[in-house]
């Protein structure tokens, strides 16, 4: 109900605007690289602390935030930051890594990210996260979830993490991929917990050939499916 909440890529503040009244007393900190979106957020949510700059340039203290939320930016490029350069993270992976350092031990992260975070063949970023946080759960969303808002069809996941109080050399099942009953490669968590996939996993034609996608169920309300999953 109170505490410090970070949104490291807040856009115009849509998430902040939809916060339940029960946590209205929390202090929200937003970061937004785009100057127009950031200034809009500053005007809309004047009681929040919103920095219009790159996440990598912020001076936010480590282990300060009780929670972090947001839709992390996605792309095939890296963010220059000496603290993390050795890990060779792409931008979405970088946002997970830096946010983990900003959240206190026991704090929770709830991020929306492309399915690439959990499904890519290279497990390095998942191992990095697992050493620093416990996976509380994940929900796979249909690829048309954000079509109306963003005009894109991308299979996305909501990932819930709780930061550990120390680094642990651990490699849980969700670090790795597995194959479902239909022969589709995906994160082992979703193979073990198919009820957390809110659609039908299929192989579809993508920009680089065939790829897996979560296709929405016909005549199903995503809101109802999401409530059941949570």
Please place each PLM-identified region on the residue numbering.
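Conserved S-adenosyl-L-methionine
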Residues: 1-77, 89, 101, 106, ...
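Auxiliary N-terminal substrate/complex-recognition segments of SAM-dependent methyltransferases
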Residues: 2, 103-108, 127, 179, ...
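Conserved Class I SAM-dependent methyltransferase catalytic core
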Residues: 35, 88-147, 154-160
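A short acidic, often aromatic-flanked loop/helix-cap motif at beta-alpha or helix-coil junctions
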Residues: 57-60, 144-148, 206
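Conserved nucleotide-binding/hydrolysis micro-motifs of P-loop NTPases
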Residues: 73-75, 116-118, 145, 165-167
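Conserved ATPase-coupling elements of RecA-like P-loop NTPase cores
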Residues: 77-81, 121
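Short glycine-enriched, charge-decorated loop/helix-capping segments at active-site entrances
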Residues: 82-87
């Amino acid at each position: 109900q109170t505490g410090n909440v970070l949104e490291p890529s807040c856009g115009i503040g849509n998430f902040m605007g939809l916060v339940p009244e029960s946590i209205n007393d929390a202090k929200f900190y937003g970061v937004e690289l785009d100057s127009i979106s950031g200034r809009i957020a500053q005007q809309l949510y004047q009681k929040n602390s919103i920095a219009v700059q790159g996440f990598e340039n912020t001076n936010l203290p480590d282990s300060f935030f009780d929670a972090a939320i947001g839709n992390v930016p996605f792309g095939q490029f890296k963010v220059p930051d000496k603290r993390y350069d050795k890990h060779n993270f792409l931008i979405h992976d970088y946002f997970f890594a830096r946010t983990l350092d900003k959240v206190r031990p026991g704090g929770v992260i709830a991020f929306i990210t492309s399915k690439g975070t959990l499904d890519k063949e290279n497990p390095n970023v998942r191992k990095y996260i697992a050493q620093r946080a416990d996976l509380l759960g994940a929900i796979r969303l249909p690829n048309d979830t954000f079509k109306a808002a963003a005009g894109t069809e991308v299979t996305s996941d909501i990932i819930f993490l709780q930061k550990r109080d120390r680094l642990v050399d651990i490699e849980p099942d969700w670090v790795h991929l597995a194959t479902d009953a239909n022969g589709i490669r995906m994160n082992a968590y979703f193979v073990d917990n198919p009820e957390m996939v809110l659609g039908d996993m299929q192989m579809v034609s993508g920009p680089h050939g065939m790829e897996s996608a979560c296709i929405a169920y016909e005549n199903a309300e995503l809101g109802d499916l999401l409530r059941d999953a949570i």
